[in-house]
Amino acid sequence: MDKYIIKPKKVRHTYMLWISAFLLIFNVYHTKLMSIFMFTASSASTFAIQGFAVALLLAYFMTDKKLKLHRIEIQPTEWLLILTLLVMLVTTENIGENLTYIIRYAVLVFIVILMKYDEEFFHIIFYCILAAGLVHVIATLWFYFDTDFYMANIYPNFNSSQRAHLYEQVQKNHHAVGLSNHYSQNGIYMAISLCASFALLFAKSRKNILWKVLLLLVVLFALILTGKRGVLIFSVFAMLISYIICKKGAFANKLITVLFILSSMSLVIYALSFYIEGIASAFARITAMFSENETLDVSNGRFKLYAIAWNFFKESPITGIGWREFSKEVVNFYNQDSVLRDAHNVFLQLLCETGIIGFSIFISLFISAIIQTVQLAAKSTKDMLKLSDKTKIVLIFSLCYQVFFLAYCITGNPLYDLETVYVYIISVGFSSGIYFSHREEIEKINRQITNKSKYIK
């Protein structure tokens, strides 16, 4: 009799995921835009946005997924994320000064723990990241080629200190700043968009492939216009490494392709540098790295920061001087201002601020997350692990962005800049969540590999 009863179709409240993802990404990409064009985005409003996003996620998972909080499984990578949060709390001398950063970090860790229970949320948050980034790409191109509009309508909205820096960057150095208050921040937006655009190319369907290639080239062009040489070099490096791992074929053939792409890019950038001042500026900054001019500091003062960080580490090698204390102490070595300065090398700053103990925990997170992601990508490339098209795109984005983040840690401050660390935690959550969703299949693959290797011996 039951088979004749029409059961009501289960309603999914996917809109909750979309709203939550939008708010989370809006919170990192556009909070500063709100303060410039709409209203002052205080810490309270930031927390309210995040709190509402988390509440929506909890409502979705507890209703649609029937998830009980006390039954949530925590994966090894997620434990490491929690430990890094504890390192911040334990080593912070003044919790009030770092409260906003720590709360945002904690919220992201909690979301990573939750989101593995619905793979669709991976896809939604990825497309929100891509869409938010493209807003900045469009603004970057528009304002670069229409400087009069930028100076008349966007530039006046910044405060006097920001305007002084922006005037020099836009009018003298020809950097594309877009909607950001510094060309460095805009370069980060471009790099994140570049990693996302690159991942789209790996969809099995070749539909709209020309549009996807064009999108990648447009975003790359916008990144070059920002003049951020480190971000440009590391993002291209991340794409090439991801290409080698995720593209089928012989390694030698892939290496030849990579070398061809690099040489072609160099020639195109060189040719365009004669016609576009922003590209000329970027090209000059890159070639300056290989200059033999002894009076030129190619590090832009980074070597001095490295020496200061190392000396602080030697003063307290086990526990460090305290989370974000380097930024406060280093101003004693500079006379011009009291602006917070990071070491422009995350690894050195971690040693300096959290000591060997905290450094070891962060490095464990970095290494375990990238190893897990590479292994997943390799299995997917060999068709051992069956992933949907959208999930594979998310995985490749996770790989590409993690490589970029870790490489940029050498000369930048991605762990301390909200835009970069936000997306990094999400990227780690992507790979950890994909592993969780397919763990039985992965364990079966690993057993087959082990048995096969024993048989060969």
Regions found by a protein language model. Give the residues of each.
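N-terminal signal-anchor transmembrane segment
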Residues: 1-65, 84-91, 405-407, 426
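A membrane-periplasm/extracellular boundary helix in multi-pass inner-membrane enzymes
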Residues: 138, 144-147, 243-293, 310-315, ...
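Hydrophobic transmembrane alpha-helices and their immediate junctions
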Residues: 76-77, 240-244, 354-404, 440
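Transmembrane alpha-helices of multi-pass inner-membrane enzymes
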Residues: 54-57, 236, 240, 394-457
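Loop-to-helix entry and N-terminal half of a specific, functionally important transmembrane alpha helix
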Residues: 17-27, 211-217, 345, 374-411, ...
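Alpha-helical transmembrane segments of multi-pass inner-membrane proteins
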Residues: 57, 85-86, 126-160, 164-172, ...
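Long extracytoplasmic/lumenal interhelical loops at the membrane interface
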Residues: 29, 290-354
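Aromatic-anchored transmembrane helix interface
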Residues: 78-82, 95-117, 123-133
